[in-house]
């Protein structure tokens, strides 16, 4: 059990929530004791500020709420809870859900179709998730639905549409775009060679820059050993933006000893 070193002038997290049990998931295993305690404090504030809304009969309990909050706060552990401003509700379906999608093709024709979604994030509005994919986000596998949708929120924090470039200094934008597009091209080259199902990075990352940023944010936090050695320049930019280094954390706290893989600069 973790001993929470709360300062006397800080408000302790809700003791009724099962924080120790909530932390016991693989994606959080490499966090230090100090990082875990700070993450819990952020997650507690998240639950005070946001409303989790279960839909279609989904039953939300304290453990589920705590784990959802922890994953929401993982990307902003060093940025601060204010980076999650801009939405007040998280809607949670029991499973992937169907939505009406409208899109325009290259010649201007508008199409409507019903599509199955795992999650959605609106620039001004709630985040929509489903529990089946949230559960899959507990593993250190490279998939993390919550981190993906949070990344979209961070992407639009500058008030513009999602572009794959989060709120960073203007002088860093060109370099970020260069490295992000290099990663997209590399991922697409692998897809062309081995197919989507055999690609080592989720093929969704190659669809556009916004999705590349969101997908690679998933790998940044849940499978850094697949991201860092392959795209070292972009990895450093992610570390600078998130103010975290999950690869170093993995080495220090989980005894990782991986082999290097091809690099893209």
From Swiss-Prot:
<dbReference type="InterPro" id="IPR042252">
    <property type="entry name" value="MtfA_N"/>
</dbReference>
<protein>
    <recommendedName>
        <fullName>Mlc titration factor A</fullName>
        <ecNumber>3.4.11.-</ecNumber>
    </recommendedName>
</protein>
<keyword id="KW-0482">Metalloprotease</keyword>
<comment type="function">
    <text>Shows zinc-dependent metallopeptidase activity.</text>
</comment>
<feature type="binding site">
    <location>
        <position position="111"/>
    </location>
    <ligand>
        <name>Zn(2+)</name>
    </ligand>
</feature>
<dbReference type="GO" id="GO:0006508">
    <property type="term" value="P:proteolysis"/>
</dbReference>
<keyword id="KW-0862">Zinc</keyword>
<dbReference type="GO" id="GO:0008237">
    <property type="term" value="F:metallopeptidase activity"/>
</dbReference>
<keyword id="KW-0479">Metal-binding</keyword>
<comment type="similarity">
    <text>Belongs to the MtfA family.</text>
</comment>
<dbReference type="InterPro" id="IPR024079">
    <property type="entry name" value="MetalloPept_cat_dom_sf"/>
</dbReference>
<keyword id="KW-0378">Hydrolase</keyword>
<comment type="function">
    <text>Involved in the modulation of the activity of the glucose-phosphotransferase system (glucose-PTS). Interacts with the transcriptional repressor Mlc, preventing its interaction with DNA and leading to the modulation of expression of genes regulated by Mlc, including ptsG, which encodes the PTS system glucose-specific EIICB component.</text>
</comment>
<dbReference type="GO" id="GO:0004177">
    <property type="term" value="F:aminopeptidase activity"/>
</dbReference>
<keyword id="KW-0963">Cytoplasm</keyword>
<feature type="binding site">
    <location>
        <position position="148"/>
    </location>
    <ligand>
        <name>Zn(2+)</name>
    </ligand>
</feature>
<keyword id="KW-0031">Aminopeptidase</keyword>
<dbReference type="Pfam" id="PF06167">
    <property type="entry name" value="Peptidase_M90"/>
</dbReference>
<dbReference type="InterPro" id="IPR057256">
    <property type="entry name" value="MtfA_enterob"/>
</dbReference>
<comment type="subunit">
    <text>Interacts with Mlc.</text>
</comment>
<feature type="binding site">
    <location>
        <position position="211"/>
    </location>
    <ligand>
        <name>Zn(2+)</name>
    </ligand>
</feature>
<keyword id="KW-0645">Protease</keyword>
<dbReference type="GO" id="GO:0005829">
    <property type="term" value="C:cytosol"/>
</dbReference>
<dbReference type="InterPro" id="IPR010384">
    <property type="entry name" value="MtfA_fam"/>
</dbReference>
<feature type="binding site">
    <location>
        <position position="152"/>
    </location>
    <ligand>
        <name>Zn(2+)</name>
    </ligand>
</feature>
<dbReference type="GO" id="GO:0008270">
    <property type="term" value="F:zinc ion binding"/>
</dbReference>
